Amino acid sequence: FADQVICFIDEPILSAFGSSTYVSVQRDDVVTLLAEMIEAIHADRAMAGIHCCGNTEWSILVDAGVDIVNFDAFEFGESIAIYPEAIQALFARDGMLAWGIVPTSAEIQQQSVETLAPRFETLMDQLASKGIDRQTIVNRAIITPSCGAGSMTPELAEMVFEITQGLSKT
């Protein structure tokens, strides 16, 4: 058994928040609905993470009380630095950023630990330039694939996880 259980919510539509299709959806409603799920997870003494593979208003997740923000850092890594106050608040309550820096698309064939490590360093530097302690960013980081690997061939999925493992050791 684990010392700490983590339950992830896969949020496939949050990236559409604010678009014309969902213009009537209010931010407070989104925060409230996510908070209800997070509170249920916390009630069972588990950590709550949310994965969003698109770009979104990341502060919504933090305001909802999530413990781990998991995002596609390969495609949208720069966007996290737009929300330094939210990330500070996440870190202040011992939350974590799960950086999906390893692509789960055909792009994986052009990537390696050697190509992704400098990219990840640059993204952390961008966030640190907003006033967040760099060592805190490192300490509160989890390295993950950008999204699920279920639609990939077994060979490419294996490559994703080998690179993820290698990158986590750098």
Model region roles, listed by residue range:
Residues 64-170:
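Catalytic-face loop-and-helix region of soluble metabolic enzyme cores
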